[in-house]
C-alpha cells in the first residue's frame, strides 16, 4: 500500500547555498504567524552566515504568493524589518526556484524509497548536503533565464516551454 505522507520543507538559499531551512511537522499548517517565525529565523541565519550582505542590507527575499507569504502580518514583518522583497508574478510557479530546482532534486533522490515520518527530515537534509555552490549558481542562472522569458512574453505562462 502506498503512503502519501507529506513532509513540508521551507528552504531559503542564495548563490552560495542554503541559508535557512525548516521542516514543518506533519499536521501543522503554515499560516502567517508561523511564516513570520520562519522569517525571523531566516534573518538570524542571514546575519550569521552572510554577514556582509546583512550589514549592507544587500540581500533580497523571493517567495511565491502563497497565502502565508501574502498575508498582512507577513507584509508588516517584512516592512518593519526592512526586508526587500522581489515580487513574484501571479500564477507563475515556474519562477519559484524551489519548484524548478530544489524540490525536483529532492524528489529525484528520494523517489521509490520508503521512510518513517520521523526519518524524513534527516533524509531530506542528506540530499540537501549533496548540493554544491555551483548547483545553486546554475539555479540562479536558470532563474534569470525564466524571468527574462516571463518578461519577454509579457507574463504569459507557458508550462514546459523550451526557454526554461
Language model features with spans:
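Surface/interface recognition patches
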Residues: 1-164
Amino acid at each position: 500500500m502506498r503512503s502519501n505522507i507529506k513532509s513540508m520543507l521551507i528552504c531559503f538559499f542564495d548563490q552560495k547555498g542554503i541559508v535557512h531551512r525548516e521542516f514543518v511537522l506533519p499536521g501543522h499548517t503554515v499560516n502567517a504567524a508561523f511564516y513570520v517565525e520562519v522569517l525571523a529565523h531566516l534573518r538570524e541565519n542571514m546575519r550569521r552566515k552572510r554577514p556582509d550582505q546583512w550589514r549592507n542590507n544587500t540581500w533580497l527575499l523571493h517567495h511565491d504568493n502563497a497565502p502565508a507569504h501574502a498575508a498582512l502580518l507577513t507584509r508588516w514583518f517584512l516592512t518593519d524589518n526592512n526586508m526587500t522583497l522581489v515580487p513574484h508574478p501571479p500564477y507563475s510557479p515556474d519562477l519559484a526556484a524551489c519548484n524548478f530546482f530544489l524540490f525536483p532534486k529532492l524528489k529525484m533522490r528520494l523517489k521509490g524509497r520508503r521512510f518513517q515520518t520521523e526519518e524524513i527530515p534527516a533524509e531530506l537534509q542528506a540530499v540537501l548536503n549533496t548540493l554544491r555552490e555551483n548547483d545553486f549558481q546554475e539555479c540562479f542562472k536558470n532563474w534569470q533565464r525564466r524571468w527574462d522569458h516571463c518578461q519577454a512574453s509579457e507574463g504569459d505562462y507557458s508550462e514546459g516551454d523550451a526557454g526554461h
